[in-house]
Structure formats: C-alpha cells, structure tokens
Amino acid sequence: MFRFWYRYVFANRTLIETGAQQAVWERRIKPDYYSYMGLVFEKVCMDYLNAKNAKGELPILYTSIGRWWGTNAATHGQEEIDLIANDGKDYLFGECKWRNEKLDISVLKDLKAKADVFSMNRKNSYYVLFSKSGFTEAVLNEARSDDSILLVDLAELMNF
C-alpha cells in the first residue's frame, strides 16, 4: 500500500486534489500499472518463499534470498533472475510472472539457462515458477516428472 501511495498518489497529489483523478489514472497510473504490479508480485513471491523456508517446507533451508542481475559470461549479455536463494551449496532459482497468459515452458528453459551462471558454485538446483494465470500443460508435465521444479499459482499464494 505504501509503495502505491508514494509511487502514484503522493507524486500526483495536487492533480488528485484538484479533481483530475481520472486523468491521473489514464495518463500516470494505467500505463505503468502492470510494471508496478510485477514488482509487487515479486515481493509477494519472496514473502511466500520466506514463510515456506521458515517452516522447512522447501527443498533447501536457505540463508539468503534476493534478486540477481549481471553479465552472463557465456553469452556476454545481461541476465536477471527474479529470486535466487541459497544455503551455501544448493540453490533455488525463481521466476515471477504477473501476466494474463499461462506461463509457458520457455520461461522454465530461460530460467535454467540463466541459472547456469552459478554452475560452479552449486551442488543441487531447484526452480520455482510463480504465475498469476497458471501454467501450460507442457510446464505441468515437466514439473510432474522433475522434483526440482516447484509451481506456485495465484490460488496457492492467496492461501499461504
């Protein structure tokens, strides 16, 4: 709530106070809303992982969690991983998607490719995908056959 307030309301308070609420929505909030919600969703996903970690309900008991971005030495391109947690030897990599479409297998493949940056420092890898709108059948099938993949949809997030 504070993020929304300071990002949109505080920055536009004069316009709002003078009756331009609709214009503020149309020109200032609406064009940026999905970007904003993506960041909020990432925070909710991190809170979910922290709660599960505290209960020992994840495949690792991590000691640190955060976001990572940097240069992939293999591709020389910039990479970003929404959530990365580790316990010193095992890693959990997470991708958070606030989209209206189901999360596709390409997101999982991309996450695994980005996680290769950490291949020298890890013993085991786990992958968690968070999706507002669920998962395609290909992702569901992959998760059924691979215990290192965790899927969390909006319904699961609402119940934790």
Regions found by a protein language model. Name each.
Residues M1-E79:
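Accessory nucleic acid-recognition modules appended to NTPase machines
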Residues L49, I81-N100, L111-A113, Y127:
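Conserved catalytic cores of phosphodiester-cleaving nucleases, focusing on short active-site segments
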Residues T63, K123-Y126:
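Residue-level recognition of the N-termini of beta-strands and the immediately preceding loop/turn
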Residues I65-A74, F93-S106:
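Acidic/glycine-enriched edge-of-secondary-structure segments
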Residues N100-K112, E137-A138:
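Active-site-adjacent loop/helix micro-motif of nuclease/hydrolase catalytic cores
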Residues A113-N124:
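Arginine/glycine-rich "motif VI" loop of SF2 helicases in the C-terminal RecA-like domain
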Residues V128-F160:
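Domain-level recognition of nuclease-like catalytic cores that cleave nucleotide substrates
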